[in-house]
Amino acid sequence: MGKSQHLKIKDLIPELKRIAGDNYVLDDQADLLVYEYDGSIDRGNPVVVVLPNTTKEISQVLKLARSNSIPVVARGAGTGLSGGAIAEQGGIVLSMARMNQILEVNRSDRYAIVEPGVVNL
């Protein structure tokens, strides 16, 4: 990602904070370190991390990113082993960590409905 794209994302931070809340938009270098990798050996440097709490917030972030041609990488718990949650092109990491509720467990039909930040610990 070029410098102009990086600056464009930085300009969007106030709008991202309006969408997700001040505490749920990370752009400090120390905060971003955790989001440079998952369980694989690959690394990438996001410009900003957004931690939405609702599907509406996700939709708003994606619309904003799309209208500004900014790459977005979705991240569940960051435990993947294939590098799928790595921001190789910079951009925005959309962390689903706050969306960690088990919504339904149907034992008879053997399925569960969970949010993307649920971990199996």
Descriptions of predicted regions:
Residues 86-100:
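A glycine- and small-aliphatic-rich helix-loop capping segment at beta-alpha/alpha-beta transitions
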Residues 16, 41-72, 96-121:
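N-terminal glycine-rich flavin-associated loop
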Residues 59, 82-83:
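Short helix/loop capping segments that flank catalytic or ligand/cofactor-binding pockets
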Residues 38-41, 83-88:
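Short glycine-biased active-site loop of nucleotidyltransferases that positions the nucleotide triphosphate
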Residues 75:
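Conserved PLP cofactor-binding pocket of PLP-dependent enzymes
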Residues 1-39, 67-70:
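N-terminal accessory segments
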